[in-house]
Amino acid sequence: EVGIDQGGGTAYFTKLLRPKALLGIELSSEPVCSLQSFLEEHDKKKCVDVRWGVDQSDTQKVPELVQEVFGDEYLDAVVDDASHLYGPSVATFEMLFPRLRQAGVYIIEDWSADHLIERRLMEEAASDPEDFARRVAVAGDVVQKTPFSMLIAQLVVASARNPDWIPLVRVARGICEVRRGIAPIASGTPLRDYLGELGQSMFNV
């Protein structure tokens, strides 16, 4: 689990799935006391390993932790609920998707957040243009960034180009499920290699 915040998802997976092993990583370096208390009560076999202060895009630390916890075993699932930013999320995908077993699932949460924020801002602008303009001026320059949803669009194209790598992409508002195919994928394979030349030209990567 990448990005555990207050640990609600970790607790849910622990109770529902009773995993043989579960690794959670979180950017914040401050442990969540309520999660620690929950694990002390419900994880007597110490199957859950939470590591704090880990950046999801750390291409050295993240693979090291996965290897430490799971060894050479394939993963059943990965849940990315961390930064919700394009760059770090691509880095995580490139590291962890190849580690999934055949038919394993990669879950990306809150991919549509940028668009929901945009809609809300446009509704506010329409209802009171002068007030909206003042608040934008106070806020300063808007930082342009690649929307998180770009990753979802690229994965859909990747499934068309390489169905033996990604046989299924299921998208709903706020959540995306990506299934692992039968073909081997080298660890750290860049996302552009999933796309093929046509896909690369579509996204200018």
What are these regions (language model features)?
Residues E1-V205:
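S-adenosylmethionine/decaboxylated-SAM
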